[in-house]
């Protein structure tokens, strides 16, 4: 089942319908309630292993390739209904990373983030950093505020899968957002609520979204 071209789930206890994109209950006994967002990383297996080489894999039997492979590659297929939208800022099937707060939403074109490698921005009141340390690394997104202080970051040349803040020189792991050296060692960056999507799908839920430009 789809709602605004996004997946709809149901819970077995109440049969309430929940949207995947924003976690809201749209029909049923729990209508109006909202699921807590648990931040995650969307990555290929190769990218995932760069940050988490000791991962345990949960694998189930199934077809050897994605059932959506053809759909993902066809730029003219936009959702089940193929609905057209008036917003022409990006091609409908452009892959974006959407970041949202209660006050605002911003889309970042994934290939632009990868080209820049590190992007710092504000989404409403939320200062964020999006990082792709290399082509073989996933894009990870963190809140830049630590203990009430907003930090700025850069990627060092001497080590992979880390970033340094320019205020204290502390070094931070991209795997979990923890400071591993420097005066802030032990401090933790929180994951920012980021969602990978096609542009048309993100627009379906956030039609007034901002679009980050390089």
Predicted segments with their positions:
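Mid-to-C-terminal functional-domain signal that highlights helix-capping/loop sites
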Residues: 1-214
